[in-house]
């Protein structure tokens, strides 16, 4: 069975514009073969609102001059910007024995584990994917699977401007509040949290893969 820490190549990409990154993810997924190494991209985006395939325009209240991009991920509307960590796992799910739901849970678990390491309890919600602390959303998810391979992923609010979330119904839920890692008393620098998130995500993929294979044995 492959080990995620050894077989998934992690790339730290800094701040990258959203649309070229989206194009690069699609191209990587379309052109990959059964031999292509999986990758994990960790980065930030300049300010942008993205609307998923299930997105409804009424959940966008007033985006001002911030661009809105209609994308092919699952989910509704969210915001990306500086101070928010984004993780895009580009995986051949068959290689890891994962389904879409299992991948979503692994992404959520990576954030739950990260926050738990700092003594902050968090939880997922079956009716609204993501990670929550005392009812406030700290991490959002949206993925796409093509030919058994995933792209898009997870965003974690760390020290970003919270105001842009007031201009939308985050993830399609009116009145949903958001929070940030730094609001939770965690002052670890962003670049260190990025590394830690990547490690916890790879560990969560490993754990989900082992559980999936055990269930089928």
Swiss-Prot record:
SUPFAM superfamilies xrefs: Class II aaRS and biotin synthetases
- EC numbers on record: 2.3.1.181
One GO cellular-component annotation of the UniProt record comes to: cytoplasm
Q: What is its main location?
A: cytoplasm
The residues that hold substrate are 73-80, 140-142, 153-155
Q: Name one Pfam family in it.
A: LplA-B_cat
Domain BPL/LPL catalytic, residue spans: 34-216
Q: Indicate where this protein resides in the cell.
A: Cytoplasm
Active-site residues?
Answer: 171 (acyl-thioester intermediate)
Give GO BP annotations, semicolon-separated.
Answer: protein modification process
Give, as one word, the top-level EC class. Answer: transferase
Concerning InterPro entries, the annotation shows:
aa-tRNA-synth_II/BPL/LPL, BPL_LPL_catalytic, Octanoyltransferase, Octanoyltransferase_CS
Summarize the protein's role: Catalyzes the transfer of endogenously produced octanoic acid from octanoyl-acyl-carrier-protein onto the lipoyl domains of lipoate-dependent enzymes. Lipoyl-ACP can also act as a substrate although octanoyl-ACP is likely to be the physiological substrate.
Q: Which family does it belong to?
A: Belongs to the LipB family.
Q: What else is known?
A: In the reaction, the free carboxyl group of octanoic acid is attached via an amide linkage to the epsilon-amino group of a specific lysine residue of lipoyl domains of lipoate-dependent enzymes.
Q: What's the protein name?
A: Octanoyltransferase
Q: What is the scientific name of the source organism?
A: Halorhodospira halophila (strain DSM 244 / SL1) (Ectothiorhodospira halophila (strain DSM 244 / SL1))
Tell me what gene encodes this: lipB
């Amino acid at each position: 069975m492959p080990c995620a820490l050894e077989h998934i190549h992690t790339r730290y990409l800094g701040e990258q514009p959203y649309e070229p990154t989206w194009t690069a993810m699609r191209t990587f997924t379309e052109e990959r073969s059964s031999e292509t190494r999986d990758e994990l991209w960790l980065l930030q985006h300049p300010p942008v609102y993205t609307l998923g395939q299930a997105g409804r325009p009424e959940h966008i209240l007033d985006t001002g001059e911030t661009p809105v991009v209609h994308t092919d991920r699952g989910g509704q509307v969210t915001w990306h910007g500086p101070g928010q960590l984004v993780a895009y796992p580009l995986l051949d799910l068959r290689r890891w024995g994962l389904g879409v739901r299992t991948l979503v849970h692994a992404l959520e678990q990576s954030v739950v584990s990260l926050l738990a390491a700092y003594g902050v309890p968090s939880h997922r919600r079956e009716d609204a994917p993501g990670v929550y602390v005392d009812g406030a959303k700290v991490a959002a998810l949206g993925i796409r699977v093509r030919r058994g391979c995933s792209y898009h992923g997870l965003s974690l609010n760390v020290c970003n401007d919270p105001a842009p979330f007031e201009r939308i119904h985050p993830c399609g839920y009116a009145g949903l509040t958001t929070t940030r890692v730094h609001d939770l008393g965690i002052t670890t620098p962003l670049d260190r949290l990025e590394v830690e998130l990547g490690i916890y995500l790879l560990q969560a993929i490993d754990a989900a893969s082992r559980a999936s294979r055990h269930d089928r044995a």
